[in-house]
């Protein structure tokens, strides 16, 4: 029976479900080989993949150019096209990040906890999940980010990208990831790409807890929330990155130069989740600081959404196709109201306080409950590579225990207790 408001899942007989289950089965069969390969082999494969990104650059850029051309013809907005596009510089950055990840020492996978009164020794271990799924936006670099993190965590991956990036993602898997794995004796089936466009493939992926117990979901808020609901109903653990939007609070102690720098550095890209989305200004200096911020924004081609607002205060412009070049502005009465507004009106991804008064900054930091809080630093830093020196699978904004903020490979593991006889 289907109840009003219930969320339906891809039928098990559908072509999408069959294809995704087959991909998950291949990944599950490959997962023991990833675990057995060990750290040195995985790290070597990541270094080889970095080399292939550079070596195969012409083919990869050509595949991406075809995706961008098709998306442009279909009317994709500028901010989304920016996320879809691979440039030689971005390809180089992807390669560098793989090398950094390969060179990153792994944290200990086992630690001693205690001796029981009866003498047994208790240890805590981190073990691989097995197969990890990922659903992400039409953003080719995420294919590499997620695959590399999952492999570093000794698991296999099933990836589903936005349909606009399917050609780019396919090229990355076939020309870079698979050959790199094969070169070091790791099963090439360890990274699977769902070959079908449309949301049915994503819905199928979150409905296979027997094969894919953990799925990282990122992208548009509405779709991500739906997939989280479907995953919960199926028994799949979903790490969801549904909404974003950075907040910048301008305190009365902030000077013009500080405001100019933070507004500028927070808006270098408009199609990303951690960009400036909501600008809050302390009421006593609203008339003084608004023109300072406005000049920087207008120079970047960004329109200010000024009060009164017909939209929600935390409306995420990065997800509003065709309207990405907007920032919402509102006055607030002090640091506490600013922090509470940022937490209440947005996803709680990230907020920055611009202030030269340390007491004000500490007040804002203590009052804000979101994932990342910054003092005189742009929210664009809430990124796995920028913040932690590691690529990320996504940014988790849950208000529950578990990995929160940029999710990297140490977060993609299971806790296991091992009890040994007395020494």
What residue ranges belong to the model's regions?
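ALDH superfamily catalytic-core signature
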Residues: 16-18, 55, 137-141, 145-156, ...
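Rossmann-like NAD(P) dinucleotide-binding subdomain of oxidoreductase/dehydrogenase enzymes
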Residues: 103, 110-257
């Amino acid at each position: 029976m289907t109840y009003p408001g219930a969320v339906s899942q891809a039928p098990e007989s559908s072509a999408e479900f069959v294809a995704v289950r087959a991909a998950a089965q291949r990944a599950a069969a490959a997962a023991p080989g990833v675990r057995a390969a060990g750290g040195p082999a995985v790290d070597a494969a990541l270094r080889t993949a970095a080399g292939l990104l550079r070596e195969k650059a012409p083919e990869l850029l050509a595949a991406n150019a075809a995706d961008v051309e098709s998306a442009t013809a279909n009317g994709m907005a500028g901010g989304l096209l920016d996320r879809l596009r691979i440039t030689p510089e971005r390809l180089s950055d992807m390669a560098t990040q793989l090398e950094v990840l390969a060179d990153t020492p792994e944290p200990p996978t086992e630690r001693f906890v205690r001796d029981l009164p009866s003498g047994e020794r208790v240890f805590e271990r981190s073990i691989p999940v097995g197969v990890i799924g990922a659903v992400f936006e039409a953003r080719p670099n995420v294919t590499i980010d997620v695959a590399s993190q999952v492999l570093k965590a000794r698991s296999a991956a099933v990836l589903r990208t936005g349909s606009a990036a399917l050609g780019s993602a396919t090229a990355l898997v076939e020309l870079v990831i698979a050959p790199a794995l094969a070169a070091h004796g790791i099963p090439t089936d360890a990274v699977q790409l769902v070959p079908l466009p449309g949301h049915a493939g994503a819905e199928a992926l979150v409905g296979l807890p027997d094969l894919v117990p953990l799925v990282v979901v990122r992208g548009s808020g509405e779709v991500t929330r739906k997939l989280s609901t479907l995953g919960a109903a199926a028994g799949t653990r979903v790490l969801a990155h549904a909404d974003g939007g950075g907040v910048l609070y301008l305190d009365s102690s902030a000077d013009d130069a500080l405001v100019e720098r933070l507004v500028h550095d927070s808006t270098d890209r408009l199609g990303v989740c951690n960009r400036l989305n909501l600008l809050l200004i302390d009421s006593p200096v609203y008339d003084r600081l608004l023109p300072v911020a406005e000049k920087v924004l207008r120079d970047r081609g960004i329109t200010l959404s000024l009060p009164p607002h017909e939209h929600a205060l935390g409306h995420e412009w990065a997800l509003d196709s065709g309207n990405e070049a907007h920032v919402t502005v509102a006055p607030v009465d002090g640091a506490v109201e600013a922090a509470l507004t940022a937490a209440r009106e947005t996803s709680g991804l990230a907020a920055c306080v611009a202030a030269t008064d340390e007491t004000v900054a500490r007040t804002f930091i203590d009052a804000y409950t979101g994932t990342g809080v910054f003092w005189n630093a742009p929210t664009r830093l809430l990124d796995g590579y920028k913040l932690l020196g590691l690529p990320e699978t996504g940014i988790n904004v849950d208000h529950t225990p578990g990995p929160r903020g940029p999710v990297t490979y140490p977060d993609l593991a299971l806790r296991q207790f091992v009890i040994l006889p007395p020494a």
